[in-house]
Structure formats: C-alpha cells, structure tokens
C-alpha cells in the first residue's frame, strides 16, 4: 500500500530524532544570513548557527475555483507523476500551457483513455519539443481559449465547466480527474535581498545546494532545479548536510 506525503515526512522526522536531531516548531519572521553567524528571528526566540539549510519548499498555484481545496485528492491534483496512476483508462483534464502542463498531458496520454488540455490562449507556451507529440497523440484534445469556471462534483470530481475567454460561453466537460499545472510559488519571501533568486523567485543553488552566501544551503523544491519530486528533495537534503558539515570543518 502507498504512503501519503504527510506520513512520510513524519517518519523521516522521527528517524532523524532517533539519531539526535532536535525539532523546534516556530515561525521565522526574519533572517540575517550574510555574517559568519547566521541569525533567525522566530516566534519562539532567536536561533543562531554557522550554517543554515533552507528547505521551505514551493506550493502549486491554485486555480482559485470554488471547491478546489475540498476536492484536492478527490479528483483534483497538482502532480501527474505523483497521482496519475489511478487514472489508467479514465478521462482526465490538464489545465495550463507551459512545459509542466505539456509534460503532464503527455505522461497522462500514455495511460488515460482521454486527456483534455485546457489553455486560456490559442497556442501553448511550452517549448516546441512537446508540440508534435501532443498534437499527434490520438487521445489528446485541446480546449483552446478556455478557463475552468466551476468544478462539478458529487463528493468527488465528476467534471468541469469551461468558459470561452472570447465569447463568455460556457459548457460542461465530464472527466474523472483534473491536474492543475499553472505554476508553483516558492516560499522565498524571507530571503529576498539576502540570497540570489532567479526570475521565478527560486533560490539559486547548484547540485551542491550551495547558495550565493557561504554557509547557506538550499534543498528541495525551493531551489533552482529541473525536477521537483520527493525523491530529488530527499537527495538534496543528504547533499546539503554533507556540504554543511564540510563547511563547518573548514571554518572552525
């Protein structure tokens, strides 16, 4: 049987604590990272250290349609790679027009009976490499110039109401699952002005997880990277700890 993300995180935390890690629950209000000693101002006081590993993550951007939150996990999803398998032989929809939406639609087309790709414009923003495979997939249908105006449901998703952005006309579309891929928002507000961020506000860090400041490392979805999944985040955590230990050994 599978395991949900929350339970997996709990088990990882418990494992770390068995080896001596200390968990402090606090909200961080301000960070000062440029000095040799890094300082975090929090709801539970001030924490200081010579290294900091940032793993604040990133959240999928919601559509903002009524009922979206309640239906999350009940037909509404944000990750085709994570949640697509149960939709084998079923009808699904993907919302978005960028690379992640195109990749999700292409992946789902290999298992789903039908895939609707819904985009508010009349062409994809995704790179050309996705265009031909999607256009030639017999079970992929494009819904151009369309937005999702309502989620149809009976305790779980049963379909969508689509709105034509040009005419305002609406029609209903039956589907078993909806995959929302309209971007992600990294939790980096605290680090603006402290660390180098890319144009999408992800922390700029290479495969060593080093950031623009010595002694500061970024792991998981919050950093610049090609693939954001649990397995790559866990890998980042191990890498960040390795280089943090190395930094401490070299800067006693």
Language-model segments: what does each one mean?
Residues 1-8:
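A short acidic, glycine-rich active-site loop
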Residues 105-106:
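Generic hydrophobic/aromatic pocket-lining and core-packing "Φ" positions
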Residues 96-98:
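Glycine-rich Rossmann-fold phosphate-binding loop(s) that bind the pyrophosphate
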Residues 90-91:
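Residues that mark the start of a beta-strand
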Residues 10, 16-42, 46-49, 109-207, ...:
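A Rossmann-like FAD-binding core segment of flavoenzymes
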Residues 101-102:
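N-terminal Rossmann-fold NAD(P) dinucleotide-binding loop
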Residues 59, 64, 69-86, 182-232, ...:
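FAD-site-proximal beta/loop scaffold in flavoenzymes
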